[in-house]
Amino acid sequence: MLKQVEIFTDGSCLGNPGPGGYGAILRYRGHEKTFSEGYTLTTNNRMELMAAIVALEALKEHCEVTLSTDSQYVRQGITQWIHNWKKRGWKTAEKKPVKNVDLWKRLDAALGQHQIKWVWVKGHAGHPENERCDELARAAAMNPTQEDSGYQAEA
């Protein structure tokens, strides 16, 4: 039987683009581990993706995961859009390169053999874990230490 793990994630950006951060909580049998990191120049969508990636990459074995995010971009991207992006060689329906493709590929790899249920929660609506992740993400964004090497400014 697979371990049942809960993951809660959020991303934040002070300006978009601007300094950003992510926050994630990984919970297993009442034990929690938190993750957060700040980046000097990034976007909110990249930080939402990073939160999910870092938490999933922390799992050491195959798990049954319930991952809660307030990002429709992440939830829809991974449950709906990614299949066609991959079929089209990481291009959109308009034949344009998928934005944040470096992180989408990393998230796709992080899914591994996990069984994942993606849950959308309304942000800033009093969901306790989402609020904690938001606090972690905003604190990280206010004290960025990393460079987001994959961020590409819009042309």
From Swiss-Prot:
Binding site for Mg(2+) 2: 10, 134
Record keyword Phosphoprotein present: no
GO cellular component labels: cytoplasm
Compartments, record wording: Cytoplasm
Catalysis: reaction(s): Endonucleolytic cleavage to 5'-phosphomonoester
Any one GO molecular function term: magnesium ion binding
Textual note on the cofactor: Binds 1 Mg(2+) ion per subunit. May bind a second metal ion at a regulatory site, or after substrate binding.
SUPFAM superfamilies: Ribonuclease H-like (SSF53098)
Cofactors demanded by this protein: Mg(2+)
PROSITE patterns registered for this protein in UniProt: RNASE_H_1
Keyword entries, A-Z: Cytoplasm, Endonuclease, Hydrolase, Magnesium, Metal-binding, Nuclease
InterPro entries found in the cross-reference section: RNase_H (IPR050092), RNaseH-like_sf (IPR012337), RNaseH_domain (IPR002156), RNaseH_sf (IPR036397), RNaseHI (IPR022892)
Positions of Mg(2+) 1 binding: 10, 48, 70
Entry-linked Gene3D superfamilies: Ribonuclease H-like superfamily/Ribonuclease H
Entry EC number(s): 3.1.26.4
Any GO BP annotation: DNA replication, removal of RNA primer
Protein task: Endonuclease that specifically degrades the RNA of RNA-DNA hybrids.
Subunit structure of this chain's protein: Monomer.
Entry's family note: Belongs to the RNase H family.
Protein name: Ribonuclease H
Organism expressing this protein natively: Salmonella arizonae (strain ATCC BAA-731 / CDC346-86 / RSK2980)
